[in-house]
């Protein structure tokens, strides 16, 4: 229910000094209209969202310049950015790193300021679990299963994931390697994820770790694995930037599932519908045998472009600094933390 204060503010927005185009935009989007009225009625100094690709939040940041609006990136962004460029124009974006900034700029996104601070989730994980995990598993499959995602919206992801899961399961069975699965679904869809897995593998032969965001269960099982394998999951890119051995796989010609902007012959990429099980196995043999120090030497220049993890401050500390500065009225300008 709308408070009287918000209703009065909505009337003021329509009858006040805003231009005709702005008033038309508000009438056309009632939710935007209500949110702007709510913000206007409480006059905040800072407005933050963890939904970085929200068109409404971008619009609000332009319609209400008196506050510091900050969108915090919550997932990896690929070539789909070009399709959203028309509305990705938030005034301040806290992003994973250089790849995100370059992708947004090259796609024509009118973002006011980029703060390349890394991944907030990854930072919270590293703060809670600062010690390097002891390796318990040879391989980890990073699940990206979500019921609607696989059945309706991303059939290519479903195809890639099934192919990858079957290849990896067979490889581990043949080579005597241990396999863990980092679950994707939260408790409300856990049963469906388990049913999906049982269609393609024998779950009694693997260690399945359900996704528990509060305990960072997926992050932990990835760090406890010698090699993690995924299609293009955000948590995979985070682990890759922490120095983990991660292999990204796309068994189609669809660039949506590629690691963007990177030559496909890299040791951490498997790509193409022509990839055979034999080729897949040879790649995994090579990655598994590499020492971590050698792996990091081969990958970290690229990895840090995706998710910055090398700065002295954790992402949450950088975020606190930005918000504290905005609360004190000291607005920063330009791109930070390059």
Please give the residue ranges for each predicted region.
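C-terminal alpha-helical cap of glycosyltransferases
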Residues: 300-338
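Active-site and donor-binding regions of nucleotide-sugar-utilizing enzymes
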Residues: 1-124, 236
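Donor nucleotide-activated moiety binding/catalytic core segment of transferases
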Residues: 37, 184-242
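Structural motif
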Residues: 1-2, 45-53, 73-74, 92, 96-98, 138, 178, ...
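Short, charged/polar "capping" segments at the starts of alpha-helices
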Residues: 5, 56-58, 100-104, 124-125, ...
């Amino acid at each position: 229910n709308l408070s009287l204060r918000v209703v009065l503010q909505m009337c003021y927005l329509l009858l006040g000094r805003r231009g005709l185009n702005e008033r038309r935009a508000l009438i056309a989007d009632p939710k935007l209209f209500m949110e702007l009225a709510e913000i206007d009625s409480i006059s905040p100094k800072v407005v933050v969202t963890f939904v970085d690709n929200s068109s409404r939040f971008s619009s609000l940041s332009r319609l209400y310049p008196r506050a510091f609006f900050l969108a915090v990136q919550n997932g990896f962004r690929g070539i789909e950015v070009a399709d959203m460029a028309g509305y990705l124009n938030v005034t301040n974006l806290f992003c994973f790193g250089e790849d995100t900034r370059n992708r947004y700029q090259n796609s024509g996104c009118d973002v006011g300021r980029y703060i390349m601070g890394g991944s907030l989730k990854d930072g919270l994980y590293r703060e809670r679990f600062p010690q390097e995990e002891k390796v318990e598993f040879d391989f980890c499959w990073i699940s990206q299963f979500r019921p609607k995602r696989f059945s309706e919206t991303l059939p290519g992801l479903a195809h890639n994931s099934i192919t990858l899961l079957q290849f990896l399961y067979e490889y581990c069975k043949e080579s005597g390697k241990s396999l863990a699965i980092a679950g994707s679904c939260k408790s409300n869809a856990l049963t469906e994820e388990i049913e999906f897995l049982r269609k393609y593998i024998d779950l009694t032969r693997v260690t399945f770790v359900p996704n528990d965001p509060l305990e960072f269960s997926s992050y932990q099982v990835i760090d406890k694995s010698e090699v993690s394998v995924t299609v293009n999951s955000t948590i995979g890119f985070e682990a890759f930037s922490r120095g983990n051995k991660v292999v990204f796989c796309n068994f189609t010609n669809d660039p949506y599932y590629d690691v963007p902007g990177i030559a496909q012959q890299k040791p951490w990429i498997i790509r193409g519908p022509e990839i055979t099980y034999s080729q897949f196995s040879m790649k995994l043999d090579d990655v598994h045998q590499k020492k971590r120090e050698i792996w990091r030497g081969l990958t970290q220049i690229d990895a840090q472009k995706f998710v910055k993890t090398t700065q002295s401050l954790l992402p949450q500390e950088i975020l606190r600094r930005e918000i504290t500065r905005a609360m004190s009225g000291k607005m920063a300008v330009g791109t930070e933390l390059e």
